[in-house]
Structures are given as structure tokens and as C-alpha cells.
Amino acid sequence: METLAAINRWLAKQHVVTWCVHHEGELWCANAFYYYDPDRVAFYVLSEDKTRHAQMTGTRAKVAGTINGQPKNVALIRGVQFQGEIRRLEGEESDSMRRQYTRRFPVALALSAPVWEIRPDELKFTDNTLGFGKKLHWLRAE
């Protein structure tokens, strides 16, 4: 649990996620601001259905991605890699996460884009501030 707590603290300070989906032999990546729910260990993003990545995702797909800062000093590099699933939320679940998202990013109140949940099954946190190449791993217990 200490590993997840360390990862959660760092993720709460970031705001952009990159994720990639695969469909019929094609890969595509996207970036978005995210709301992170540490209790669910999930990211929430807004993205229009007409985007290439949303069309490739359908309502649910496997996903992989990263979240990272941009330090110039290698000793300060920190970042998360993940793999899991992305799905489009509907109904009350969507409404609830939209409220959380717009609390963090009020400008999103003007958007009607669907809410998507990225639910990692695995997180790998590289934190060079703990020592060069230090990795913390977390796996979702099913």
C-alpha cells in the first residue's frame, strides 16, 4: 500500500495523461488533462466521440500510457507508465465523474464531450529522486 500511496501523491500533482489504443493493427495516442481518483486508481478524461482514439476505442478497449514531468536534470526524472482498460462512462457514473473533473478544471464546464475512465491494472513509477532508476510497481488485485 505504501507503493500506491507514493504513486498517488505524485499523480495528484500532475495533470496531463498520454494514452494509446490499438485497433485492427493500428496504434494511436492522445493527450488530455485528467482527474485522478486515488480510491478507484483511475484517471478520468473528456474526449469527443469523433476523435480517432475514441473511434478506435469504441465503448471499451485495452490501453497503455504515461504521465511524466519535464525536468532537465536526470536526477529529478519521475514518471508513470501504465496498462489497463479505457471505457466510455454513461449515466450517473458519467455525471459524477464530470462533476469531479470540472471541479479540477472549471474551463471544462463549457465542454459536452463524453467522460472516459482509464483504469490501470498495472502502474510502474520511475522516481530518480529516490535513486537513479528507482522503480515502484503496483498491480491491481482482482
Swiss-Prot record:
Transmembrane segments: none annotated. It comes from the Bacteria. SUPFAM superfamilies: FMN-binding split barrel (SSF50475). HAMAP family: UPF0306. Belongs to the UPF0306 family. NCBIfam families: PRK03467.1 (NF002900). This is UPF0306 protein Ent638_3591. It comes from Enterobacter sp. (strain 638).
